[in-house]
Amino acid sequence: MNSGSLQRRLVSPDAPEAQEVHRLVSVVGDRLQDRFAEINASMNSAIEAGMDELNEPDLLDMLHASVEGNIATILHMIRNDIPLDHVQPTTAATEYADRLGQRDIPASSLRRAYHFGSDDLLAFMFEEVQGLDCSPELQLRVLHHLSGWMHKYVDWITRVVLEVHEEGRRFSAEQNATVVSAMVTKVLRGDDVSAREFATRTGYALERPHLAATLWIDRANPGSDNTAVLETVARDLAVRLGCPRPPLCTIVDRSTAWVWFAAPADHDLSSGAIHAVIETIPGLRVSLGTCQSGVDGFRASHF
């Protein structure tokens, strides 16, 4: 829905009925405030029922705090006719978005949660508008105004929390990359690293057969960051090789990555399987090691 159609839903300040619409909106806000606990419980239930990925026990308290904070903000604004550009997102909402980003829960889940919640709140608004002591025409005008206002609020708050979510996701990815790089370095230089610790920190088991590879972009622009491209290539190669699990990928620089594949016994090293991936990226080069097992094999396949 574009901003023009949303704006048409909101009552114009110059409209003859503007003052009365805003008064009735405030009345609706007061009545919704009296039902705060009911609305809060209903909105949480709607989100939890529709989105299993947000129901991890340690995330539920943060979800509930975010929902409560958003409801309080919305009702405060419509009861007091406060413009959107005069409000800040609640701490609970931004903290929840940050945590979802760090957990690598998709941004689409956060966006959907806001739409589930806003739809639920709109249903309560509709109930209260129906109970207003005014003409049906004015009730419809109030409902249109509230609907347009809610769409503007959701558009604003989702843009805010999605930015926070991306910052959290990026921070977590950088932290994980640092941990993985440190563990790989320890193994390659022969430090005493237990297989259990390595698997816990990197998600990759040292006991299985490994096939190491070096990926790089030949003559890459030093100013271009090819990290995401190399990570995508690593995953694509894992699929082509028939690997049962995701590869372990550590970034050396902006155009180079070291990768270990959990190689199946019947992995396909034919040039066709490799070239099918290489040819999609200009300048991409792949150097494969030999398939070897265990901690020593992890090192030997790389070197």
Explain the meaning of each model-derived region.
Residues E174-F303:
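Hydrophobic helix-rich structural segments at or within alpha/beta enzyme and signaling domains
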Residues M1-A182, R201, C243-R245, I281:
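Alpha-helical/coil-rich non-catalytic "connector" segments in signaling and regulatory proteins
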